[in-house]
Amino acid sequence: MTKQIAIMGVGAAGSYIGAHLTREGYDVTLIDMWGKHVDAMQDNGLHVTDALGEFTVPVKAIHLTDAMQMNQQFDIAFLAVKSYDTEWAAHFLKRFVKKDGVVVDSQNCM
């Protein structure tokens, strides 16, 4: 069974992690608070350029307010928000992580 993965915060770090995990076949849900960004990801996927080249991958992206209605439980949740959003985002994400799930802090110190 494939692990269910959530990424809270889809800026530079969250986008990079989410795009690579999705490309490798993992079931990833991206959660972000910026509606236009969510719309763009839904319409265009994520485009990544790194030292190994470029790729675009379609992603499952949802807005924070839509995530509040989710019943899904995740095995792994990445916290990829700015430091000033850590507390509320961690509390928000907690209800979606399985009891034996893991939260990975992947903040970039901004």
Specify the residue positions occupied by each region the protein language model found:
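A generic structural signal for alpha->beta connector loops
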Residues: G25-D27, P58, D100
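N-terminal glycine-rich dinucleotide-binding loop that anchors FAD/FMN and/or NAD(P) in oxidoreductases
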Residues: L46-L64
